[in-house]
């Protein structure tokens, strides 16, 4: 049978004298197509959950998060007892923390900002470290009090005591006198070569660079080094930090090093001399840097390893790695 409404041949059993209007609930003038038979007879979609139902789900998740944190605390309590008999030294584990933060960023998805997730985990790590072995954060405020406080609170929270200092050497000296404290000092600029105090054996060392997850709009973007004492087995050595003292330091030698490494340079007491803090990645070496200095007309007076840290994990502003 030929349908005037659709211009197609329809099976006889689909039409009756009243079809398609009566049989399929169509209004006169409404076009008819076989596909409409399915759409008109399909079930309505299920109603969305109510606000109350969603709030119950959220409350349940919040309770689970709290329960898991308490369970983590129970494990830390057992860990403390084990460490009292099996381990000596600081509770900081820079290599483990770096691995944990990388995995956190890689698996993160959804609308929750990465900033929030990163800060929550940093505070969890710092607080449980503090519970294991109480420590204080000694911060050099000479680079800007507000930015340094933001960095300290973002990465260590409010449970860990915060102690202000007004030059980096004072912060490092306080850590040297302590049992397990740490210092935060600028990673990009300084007026004094504070890292010289890290050269001797047994002194504190650079153990981390923050923020570890680096992006342009980071809420605690001030680059800082973390200085403390940790077990050699706990260190991460992806980037080595070297204290290098040179003579013949000038703009030409600085330009010669810029493609090879990040450098903080401070003039020292020697004529045309400088104390350098050099970041040596796996893509280069101290020998290459020394050769570049010599080729540029400088001479190396001494060098000493003063710490190491993880390679920074860079993401875009929207959180993509």
Task: Spell out what each predicted region is.
Residues 2-4, 14-16, 21-321:
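Domain-level signature for soluble enzymes in the chorismate/prephenate branch of the shikimate pathway
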